[in-house]
Amino acid sequence: GCALSPKDVRETTLEAMATASRVATFVGKGEISVSPEVAYIIQEKCDRCEICIKVCPVAAVEKSPEAITINPISCVGCGICVPRCPREAIDLKNSTEAQLMAQIRGVSEGGKPPKIIAFLEKEIAYGSADLAGQSRVSYPSNVRIIGVPSTGRVSLKHLLQAFAYGADGVVLLEDHGGVFKEETLREHVTQMKKELREYGVEPLRLMSFSTTLPEYGKVTETFETFNSRISKMGPLSEENRAKIREKLQSN
């Protein structure tokens, strides 16, 4: 309702009724369903630095005298906390770091250049790209999509994995109204562009934007524009890819 943003009476009433309905279901059954894809802390690695508490957008990370834990009911599984843990003490159930790294490598390998890896927030952003296909609006076939809970889940390590095994450009596409806000996304990408320079990767090989579900035209147009840019830049050199792979393996 109006606690979220200015709204008219009709919209406020509808949102209030929807909220009341969800609460009534919970109270009536005395139970609630929890997504299997929620974050958890690997306690033997955790040094209780509390960075996860600061970055969680829904305050799902809880501190007690014994340990730091993640409330599975509050957690929305966005994955923002995972790459920000300096000790790699956080992971996502059923969507682990190892699974994501393997998926990135598999999608990046093979095919003809230029290859573009697009990390899409898996609900709205992915749905928008899917809607483009249903509407018979095409985008370049060399754009390969990987669904993620939010683009905040994607770190420099994931970008390097993509570039090391065949990607020539990377796109991050976020839900405009999601938990990973547009301003935070811009800051995140700006920082990663600076870090990519240190690995010999031009910052222009990375771009980001946000979308809403109906804006599939914007999604396809941006893919086209980015594809043209990467085509002009040409593929990343094999020598550079080899150096990145070596650094990844040494970490």
Task: Identify the function of each model-found stretch.
Residues A20-V27, E31, A89, I230:
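Conserved NTP-handling cores and scaffolds of large molecular machines
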Residues I41-Q43, I70-S74, G177-F180, S210-T212:
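Conserved short loop/turn motifs at secondary-structure junctions
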Residues G1-A16, A20-S21, T96-N251:
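Iron-sulfur-associated redox domains of electron-transfer enzymes in respiratory
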Residues T25-K45, A98-G106, I244:
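Long, charged amphipathic helices and adjacent flexible linkers at domain junctions
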Residues K45-I51, G217-T220:
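Short glycine/threonine-rich loop-to-helix capping motif typified by GTGT followed
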Residues D47, I51-V76, I80-Q99:
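Iron-sulfur cluster-binding cysteine motifs and their immediate structural context
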Residues I42, C52, N71, H158-L159, ...:
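Residues within well-ordered alpha-helices
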Residues G1-D8, P36-A39, E66-I68:
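Short beta-alpha connecting loops at secondary-structure transitions
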